[in-house]
Amino acid sequence: MLDTAKSSIRQQQHPLISRLADLILSYWEKYLELDPYQLPDGLGYVEGRLEGEKLVIENHCYHTPQFRKMHLELAKLGNNLDILHCVMFPNPHYPLPMFGCDIVASKAGVSAAIADLSPTNPQGTLPTTYQKVLSSLPKRDFSQRRDLPPWGDIFSEFCLFIRPTNSTEETFFLERVEQFLELHCRQSLIAQPLSSNEQALYLAGQYNYCSQQQKNDKTRRVLEKAFGAEWADKYINLVLFDLPD
């Protein structure tokens, strides 16, 4: 069981981040058999300084039979910047996509909110059941959709990347992430193991996803300024997007 009573920086973060963090943890606990995932020493909770402001990074990490690693990262820079980052890394024994979402918020509001179920199979497509369910979801209008980065071909056609401009759009985003989460958790429970040959192919897909995500220069620059290049490289490669064995 998750220790939800434990103090968390999400209680001081932007309301959308706080609501989404609670939602993610509640779905994990509802559907999955969670065991703690051991992060490298000193990287579970981190404090530093960036441009005179205190930077706090708080990680929640678990694993299950279906997921080799489930990572929720919350970060807060003074009173100026709040971040949520979440990825569910599948156990390559199962034909599951990658769930991922990120939110970046400041006093001015949410500047970026992205969520996706990203393919890991050799065809670069989601399983048929995922496609059917996601295609049937109600269409929502967002006033400011954002462009994916150059390496964004790892994402699916259902990827949602926006700058929500009001509380209604924030609620629509939260609703869509919840739909992604419920579908993904339910499908993971009925997923059938792959053959050894198939496992190698899905492992390659996950490897590609992590390798492309490691190219996110914005994340690297922030971490390097606060903790140095060596630490940033270690954190990105061992915590954020560790490559599967």
From Swiss-Prot:
GO biological process, one term: phytochromobilin biosynthetic process
The enzyme's E.C. designation: 1.3.7.5
Single GO molecular function: phycocyanobilin:ferredoxin oxidoreductase activity
Keyword Oxidoreductase in record: yes
Gene3D superfamilies noted in UniProt: 3.40.1500.20
Catalysis performed (reactions): (2R,3Z)-phycocyanobilin + 4 oxidized [2Fe-2S]-[ferredoxin] = biliverdin IXalpha + 4 reduced [2Fe-2S]-[ferredoxin] + 4 H(+)
UniProt feature coiled coil, ranges: none
Keyword vocabulary terms for this entry: Oxidoreductase
Family recorded in the similarity comment: Belongs to the HY2 family.
Function: Catalyzes the four-electron reduction of biliverdin IX-alpha (2-electron reduction at both the A and D rings); the reaction proceeds via an isolatable 2-electron intermediate, 181,182-dihydrobiliverdin.
Official protein name in the record: Phycocyanobilin:ferredoxin oxidoreductase
Organism in which the protein naturally occurs: Gloeothece citriformis (strain PCC 7424)
Gene giving rise to this polypeptide: pcyA
